[in-house]
């Protein structure tokens, strides 16, 4: 195999991998659009969303300033996503660090082919 052929094949592999990554992002973005339309119709609070770059993945982050509101937002979204997915989260975690911050994490492994992770950090107020 010549260097030119090797470079061409490498470029084709990179192009195919990039196209697959973008396809996964598009799948995540499409699901996010559907979820946001439902959220608006159901009166859910606005939260921050990130679309993953390596997999079909969405990360929702509850960031309300008041910690009790942040927890309420998390619970509202947890219930809504669970209802839409037809099941509760595949993984649920709640843990506290040494400063007293509690991290809430729910994850659905494959909701319409997309991994959804919902998080909220509840800081100790005082």
Residues of each region from the PLM?
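Structured alpha/beta or helical-core interaction and ligand-binding surfaces enriched in interleaved
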Residues: 2-126
């Amino acid at each position: 195999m010549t260097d030119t052929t090797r470079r061409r094949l490498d470029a084709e592999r990179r192009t195919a991998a990039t196209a697959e990554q973008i396809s996964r992002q598009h799948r995540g973005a499409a699901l996010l659009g559907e979820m946001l339309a439902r959220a608006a119709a159901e009166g859910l609070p606005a939260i921050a969303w990130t679309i993953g770059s390596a997999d079909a993945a969405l990360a929702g982050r509850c960031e309300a300033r008041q910690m009790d509101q942040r927890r309420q937002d998390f619970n509202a979204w947890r219930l809504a996503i669970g209802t839409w997915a037809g099941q509760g989260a595949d993984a649920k975690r709640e843990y506290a660090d040494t400063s007293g911050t509690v991290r809430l994490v729910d994850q659905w492994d494959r909701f319409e082919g997309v991994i959804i992770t919902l998080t909220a950090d509840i800081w100790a107020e005082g």
